[in-house]
A protein has these predicted regions:
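Hydrophobic transmembrane alpha-helices and their helix-loop junctions in integral membrane proteins
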Residues: 1-2, 11-178
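Short phosphate-coordinating micro-motif centered on Lys-Gly-acidic
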Residues: 7
Length: 179
């Protein structure tokens, strides 16, 4: 359900930026939509991999975790394949470096209220999804690949902070401080 509603949320985001935005609004709306849909393709592959790796009976996260005995029944090699896919999918949504390039254009072209929704809700869904799905259902791969998390989040923090410091437009400051 989370994936489905995340995809449905792209439609109003595209319209809010593309119709009521300013500046290069069509470019920003299309870039946001295409990048988030590209991330969704990776995420969908990861979700289907988790579904089939867990027995293919349900898409409910709690039922999968209970059915697989705390998610350790998914083979380690499969976890190493599905975890990066879910991580990239949620990383694009959360605007994690290097998947953040949609964020500055989307924030700058969006109406102010939509820009705040991006920073306050949409981008946080990426981090929530990564913790709730990827790390909860694929714990062995998350533990083994945690160094990648640390490197990318460290780069995101430093890059976002320095990029926000040199901006003069308030929407770009908001965009880079959200990376």
């Amino acid at each position: 359900a989370m994936f489905m509603f995340y995809e449905i949320a792209l439609i109003p985001m595209y319209l809010l930026i593309g119709v009521w935005g300013s500046g290069r609004k069509e470019y920003a709306a299309m870039k946001l939509t295409l990048m988030l849909m590209g991330g969704s393709a990776f995420l969908m592959c990861g979700i289907f991999g988790i579904f089939y790796g867990a027995g293919g009976n349900t898409m409910n996260i709690i039922d999968i975790a209970n059915h697989t005995g705390g998610a350790h029944a998914i083979a380690h090699n499969w976890q190493l394949l599905w975890f990066p896919m879910t991580f990239v999918g949620f990383g694009v949504l959360g605007a994690l470096f290097p998947f953040h390039t949609w964020s500055p254009d989307g924030h700058a072209s969006a109406p102010t209220a939509v820009s705040m929704l991006h920073a306050g809700v949409l981008m946080k869904l990426g981090g929530y999804g990564c913790f709730r799905i990827a790390m909860y259902l694929l714990p062995e791969a998350a533990n083994e690949l945690s160094w990648i998390f640390l490197v990318l989040t460290g780069i995101s923090v430093v890059y976002g902070a320095f990029s926000a410091c040199v901006q003069t437009d308030l929407k770009y400051i908001n965009a880079y401080s959200s990376v």
